[in-house]
Amino acid sequence: VSAIFGLVASILIIWTGDGSAYQVAQKQPMKLAAMEGLYEGGNGVGLVGIGILNPAKTSYLDNQNAFIFDIKFPKLLSFLAERDMNAYVPGIVNLIEGGYTTNKGTVALSAKEKIEKGKTAIKALADYRKAVKDKDTAAAAQYRVTLEENFPYFGYGYIKDPAELIPHVGLTFYSFRVMVILGCFFILLFIITLIWDKKGKIANTRWLQYVGLWSIPLGYIAGQAGWIVAEVGRQ
């Protein structure tokens, strides 16, 4: 019963995880780029299955390769992000510099432009509050329009350096892979357990019992890795 429950739960988690990854791509593209160690985006981008980040790469501005070694599933990241194998997925550099055409047909703003709009929104809010306090309705209406136009970038107004917008790539990248690899491991473990149980061998298979026992902490590790990805990469 526990193996059946574990298998169903693991499959559901992967299914909901796919939906979460899609939402990340839509709402927090910088997190997705950090999860994949993706500095330069493009069309038909592959998903890194296994990879070792290059420790010599310390800035998005340097010319170092992002990886020492990596194996990718062709075009899978584009499908994960946009449900289109050939869709464009921006990388860290693209998100900072802007200027690319999004899949919605709009031109992406640069980080500096977003920061300026954020500062404009912050100032407009202060001016609006002052105008309301002074009962200057005309000025208040004007400042409110400015605030509403720039409000989507309000938080950017507190950013001093565009590099602050980049999550810790190494921590996010490896945590994501720990979570995914353990999730796949659990599915395999539960399938093997069910097969052995159906054959009536599980009671006498000590190694499988030990693997099941030793796997208990891995569930907590997978959960914590997921939280690291969620919080460290938050935008």
What is each model feature region?
Residues 1, 181-222:
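Juxtamembrane interface at the cytosolic side of transmembrane helices
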Residues 5-13, 132, 213-233:
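Hydrophobic alpha-helical membrane-insertion segments
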Residues 5-119:
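Aromatic-rich transmembrane-lumenal/periplasmic boundary elements in polytopic membrane proteins
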Residues 11-21, 191-201, 224-230:
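Transmembrane helix-loop junctions and nearby membrane-interface residues
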Residues 92-93, 97, 110-113, 121-133, ...:
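Membrane-interface interhelical connector segments
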Residues 140-171, 175, 182, 217-235:
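Membrane-proximal extracellular juxtamembrane segment immediately upstream
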